[in-house]
């Protein structure tokens, strides 16, 4: 069976503002199945942003579990992320899920992987998915050389990733916390 491929999710934190954005393309093999998927969402009373890359069903499964962890830990992002990563690493069924998450609240941004990693990105910039390297490089260059807002940096870096990665389109959804 063919795998669902790619997307690009990028987050930029600058001062007390954070933006998280993603494209909308879902690809199965060499076919674009959907161009307007929503891979960036607000959860936990709109206080937490989450973006996902990887298998769509896998990502939704992890998103549900992450929301439950946030509820259990009263919105403590780091604690919820670590608990999800531990479950993901140790649970036989969860270990098969192929997805990654970026989560952000007013003070913290984290990348959560299926290897049990919970990473606090250096410089407040991170990206995942097939176009992640392009988006992250663009975001770093823009953050270091301009005064653009996090939202503007995310928008421009997604545009650049969409120009370079065949699994990333220009249908962007960007959420912010200020």
Curated annotation (Swiss-Prot):
* Entry GO terms, CC: HslUV protease complex; proteasome core complex
**Which EC number(s) does the record attach to this protein?**
3.4.25.2
Q: Which UniProt keywords apply?
A: Allosteric enzyme, Cytoplasm, Hydrolase, Metal-binding, Protease, Sodium, Threonine protease
Q: Which reaction does it catalyse?
A: ATP-dependent cleavage of peptide bonds with broad specificity
Can you say where in the cell this protein is located?
Cytoplasm
Q: How is its activity regulated?
A: Allosterically activated by HslU binding.
Gene3D superfamilies per the UniProt record, alphabetical: Glutamine Phosphoribosylpyrophosphate, subunit 1, domain 1
Ranges in coiled-coil conformation: none
Catalytic class of the enzyme? hydrolase
A biological process (GO) annotation for this entry?
A: proteolysis involved in protein catabolic process
In its UniProt record, a GO molecular function of this protein is:
threonine-type endopeptidase activity
UniProt xrefs under SUPFAM superfamilies? N-terminal nucleophile aminohydrolases (Ntn hydrolases)
**Where is Na(+) annotated to bind?**
162, 165, 168
* The organism's place on the tree of life at top rank: Bacteria
Active-site residues, as the UniProt record annotates them: 7
Classification via NCBIfam families: ATP_dep_HslV, PRK05456.1
- What is the documented function of this protein? Protease subunit of a proteasome-like degradation complex believed to be a general protein degrading machinery.
Q: How does it assemble?
A: A double ring-shaped homohexamer of HslV is capped on each side by a ring-shaped HslU homohexamer. The assembly of the HslU/HslV complex is dependent on binding of ATP.
HAMAP family given for it? HslV
Family, as annotated:
Belongs to the peptidase T1B family. HslV subfamily.
Name this polypeptide is given: ATP-dependent protease subunit HslV
